[in-house]
């Protein structure tokens, strides 16, 4: 359940073979969690999962029932085991292409490699699933690019459609 000072719940998933095996410390998940807390999200779950599409899909389905926002970090590039976008698209009812486009657009201002990110954003029921790059800086910068959109998108998903 969300802390009273927080309006929305969030789950953070680090997708990384090496982190899931304990060979590397997860730095992206904690960085993303910290930023979400600053924006008044209550991070209720943090998980680390290997780059396995079926495992990612199963986890996203479960977390979309537990949190309004599910943020993944990692597995969005072009390497053979980067399957986070495929897993996300497979479990979403609708994709929000503009959100991913905004993240890439902002990322391109810092590095040309942002063009290689295949991250997507989509809705599953009343939850939003957002893919971020695996590097701590890339994950934080991508999330910062869309934090202003998230509350409105989450409100729309529960039917709050009044416009002021």
Task: Name the predicted role of every residue range.
Residues 1-164:
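Non-catalytic beta/alpha edge segments that cap or flank active sites
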